[in-house]
Amino acid sequence: MAWLLFMDECGHDHNAVPYEVRGGFAIADSALWPFVQDVHRLELECFGARLADYKSEIKGTKLLARDRFKNGLRDPVFDKATRQALCRAHLQDGLEKKPPGKLKLTAYGQASLKMADGIFDLLERHKALIFATAVPRGEGKPVKGEPPPPDILRKDHTFLLERFCYFLEGKREMGLLVMDEVEKQEDRRFVQRMHDYFQKTGNGRYRSKWIVPSPFFVASDMALPVQVADVVIYVLSWGYRREREMTGPTRLEIAERYEHRIDKLKWRGEGYDGVKTFRSFGIVCVPDLYKPRK
């Protein structure tokens, strides 16, 4: 059996969210297709339509925007048929650039929260695990006048691969990386850095025994699991603060609803540094991105 780690990133613009997060969720290959089918069914149950048919997609910024919470938590609470009909009308209004109506916004907000809740239910049901790194906003920028080497994989990436490798090694199973494509030239540079890491460093060569060194890039609007990964890392950035170093601003409505879900899904296991074993976790904060660790 193999495990696929579906990854996305948020906060790389260093503006909107308190943490630059990279990562997502790992799922066994045998569970992937049942999971995708269940997400499709959930989408139809919530919205009464496929969002892709209306030039939209599942994203954390869309499902869990502040106005989605505001609209989704107000009365009236619609029954399924009414909610679905209003959601389809709202999506069609978006295509036709019509102003949204209050009832449609309420229904769409309820559907969005139901979708986000259901995603975490399905991740648990299909025994997925969360692996992610969080860099405080602003720390992702190198020190002025001291640009990092362009061919070196960033510390947060290596920590993410490290935790995924610990998990795979414990299972004695292989892992594949599936990533959201961003910009072709930047993706090529990342692949080269990844290649150098796995070929030219001792840790990388060892971890290539468990992680296939060549990542797969997919368009998120055509890959539902990558869209789910986007929801996971958006929630993590705004609502997960159980790591000691994560003290950034929080959206309480997200934290209260989802922090315990993230904590339940994060990987817990053991790592090994060549001398001893120690407890390790799938989520790690990296506040010292460009500083050496003692």
Model-identified regions with their sequence ranges:
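Phosphate-ester processing/binding pockets and catalytic centers
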Residues: 1-294
